[in-house]
Structures are given as structure tokens and as C-alpha cells.
């Protein structure tokens, strides 16, 4: 497949260069204008993993797609490394769209966005704020604020996450005094750390040959908790998320409640929900049959709505 690795200045922060790969459809003609889709990776992931998988497969269906590394992560610039600030992650999507609008072969009126896991939540938030996004797709959606407040299966009270806010605050002080940034796992760092099979697969995805990648260590800066805990990826979705929305989630995903929540809260007149029977959260990252089913829903959705 024809692709082009690019690096461009983040329009929100000119000191940061964003690294991305653009995938082109079959028989690409640079004199034409194409529908384009921005792909956002999970928390702790990079463009070479599941975001790249979906970018390639959607490009095969006729779209120009771009998978990128978030600021402070992967091959993109920024210090401290592995900062997971949800507000910056959301703004990165708009920065990538800024870049797309400079490409002659992209139709600026037909740009969509899609994300996996936390990248899906960031995609929803970006669409709430950025009207250039004409349609969104989500796969195994995670509202990162909700999951840190309420747990993987939504069985923890928000007030019980207050110690995390304190931990993030204390980390900022220790970071400055020690000169080293404290970190926290975004997926289990060891197999024995996983509380269930689904999260054991998250460890397997990020830390074994299944999908591990050198620029995806699977952790974030501990100071990120200050922004994560109070963040709501779906804030004002009831009012401003009016774009067509296609949600895809596995029937066995512990995270499915966050896809349910997005569907309930989105004000879109055209919102669709496809459940992949038998799939858990991680299956939709790289399970061949499950990903194929997701693409069979997402590709026609974007073709229709962009």
C-alpha cells in the first residue's frame, strides 16, 4: 500500500513536531480530492499499532487516512515524554486536521475522525469542539476521565478517585525536585498485574510480540492524573455532538459502558451502534475477524457521511 511518513509542526505548539503516516487509496491520483479520516491511537499506543491497522484498512476502501503519534509520545516531539494530557490529546486531532487542510488532494469539506480506546473518546471531544469534523467513528471507546474515576467496569464511585488527584499533584512537586518524571501504567506492565483476562490481553498487546512497539512503553507521566481525573471526553455532547456518529464495541468488553454512554449522550440525529458479538475490548485492536467486521461497518458509514 502506498503511504508517506510525514512530520509537521503542531499548530497548537510550534515547538512540537508531530509524526504521522498518510495512507493512500488504491489508484491514488494526486490531482483529485479525497475524503480523509484522522486516526487517533489509544492511551499508551502509537501510530504503528491498532490506529495504523484501521488507517490501512480504511485507505483500502478509498479514503486518504492519517495515523499520528500524539504530542509527547511515539515519534512526535515534546517533553516530558509520555505526557497524557487529555486536553492536548484532543487538540492534537484538530492540529492534524490543520495539516490536512494544506494538502491539495484532501477535500476540506469531507474530513472525518476515528479513534480506538482513549483515542475514540478524544475523537468525540474533538468533534464537539471542531466543526470541520463531519463524521466520527469509535472503536472500543474509552472516556479516559470516566475510566480513571469509575473503574474498568464502572463500579467505583468518583469520590474514591480523589487520592489520584493528590497523587498527580504530589508527582508534580517530586518531578521538579528530583528532575525525573514519575510514571504510571496505562496497561498492566506485568502479566501478574492484570486483574482479569481482558486486561491480561492489554498487557499482552503492549508488552509481547503480539503488538509491542519500541516507542510505546505502555505508561504515562503520573502528573497526567491532574488532568485525567476531572476530564470528560463527552462534555456537552448532549448539545454539540451533532455530527453523524458510528460506535463499534464488543459485546464482551468491560469498557462497553462507555460506548453506551456516548450513544446516549450524543445529540446526533444520525448515530449508530454496532456490537461485535463475542469480542472484548482488545479483540477489536487486532483480532482479524473482529477488525474486519468493524471495517465493514465503518467504511460504508464514512462513505455515506463524508
UniProtKB/Swiss-Prot annotation:
PANTHER family: SUPERFAMILY HYDROLASE, PUTATIVE (AFU_ORTHOLOGUE AFUA_2G16580)-RELATED. It holds the Pfam family Peptidase_S15. The lineage of its organism: Bacteria, Pseudomonadati, Pseudomonadota, Gammaproteobacteria, Enterobacterales. GO terms for molecular function: hydrolase activity. This is Uncharacterized protein YcjY. It comes from the Bacteria. Disulfide bonds: none annotated. It comes from Escherichia coli (strain K12). GO terms for biological process: cell division. The gene is ycjY.
Amino acid at each position: 500500500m502506498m503511504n508517506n511518513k510525514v512530520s509537521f509542526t503542531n499548530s497548537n505548539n510550534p515547538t512540537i513536531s508531530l509524526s504521522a503516516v498518510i495512507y493512500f487509496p488504491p489508484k491514488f491520483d494526486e490531482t483529485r480530492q479525497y475524503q480523509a479520516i484522522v486516526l487517533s491511537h489509544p492511551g499508551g499506543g502509537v501510530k504503528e499499532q491498532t490506529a495504523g491497522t484501521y488507517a490501512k484498512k480504511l485507505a483500502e476502501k478509498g479514503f486518504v487516512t492519517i495515523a499520528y503519534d500524539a504530542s509527547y509520545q511515539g515519534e512526535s516531539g515534546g517533553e516530558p515524554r509520555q505526557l497524557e494530557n487529555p486536553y492536548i490529546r484532543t487538540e492534537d486531532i484538530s492540529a492534524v486536521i490543520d495539516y490536512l487542510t494544506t494538502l491539495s488532494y484532501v477535500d476540506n469539506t469531507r474530513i472525518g475522525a476515528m479513534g480506538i480506546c482513549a483515542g475514540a473518546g478524544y475523537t468525540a471531544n474533538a468533534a464537539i469542539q471542531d466543526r470541520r469534523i463531519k463524521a466520527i467513528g469509535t472503536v472500543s471507546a474509552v472516556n479516559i476521565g470516566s475510566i480513571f474515576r469509575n473503574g474498568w467496569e464502572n463500579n467505583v464511585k468518583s469520590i474514591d478517585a480523589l487520592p489520584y488527584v493528590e497523587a498527580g499533584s504530589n508527582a508534580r512537586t517530586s518531578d521538579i525536585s528530583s528532575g525525573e518524571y514519575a510514571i504510571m501504567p496505562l496497561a498492566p506492565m506485568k502479566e501478574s498485574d492484570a486483574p482479569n483476562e481482558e486486561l491480561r490481553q492489554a498487557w499482552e498487546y503492549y508488552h509481547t510480540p503480539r503488538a509491542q512497539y519500541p516507542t510505546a512503553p505502555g505508561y504515562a507521566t503520573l502528573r497526567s492524573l491532574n488532568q485525567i481525573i476531572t476530564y470528560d471526553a463527552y462534555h456537552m455532547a448532549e448539545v454539540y455532538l451533532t455530527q453523524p456518529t458510528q460506535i463499534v464495541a464488543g459485546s464482551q468488553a468491560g469498557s462497553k459502558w462507555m460506548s453506551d454512554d456516548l450513544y446516549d449522550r450524543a445529540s446526533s440525529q444520525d448515530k449508530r451502534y454496532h456490537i461485535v458479538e463475542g469480542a472484548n475490548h482488545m479483540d477489536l485492536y487486532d483480532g482479524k475477524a473482529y477488525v474486519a467486521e468493524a471495517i465493514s461497518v465503518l467504511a460504508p458509514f464514512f462513505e455515506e457521511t463524508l
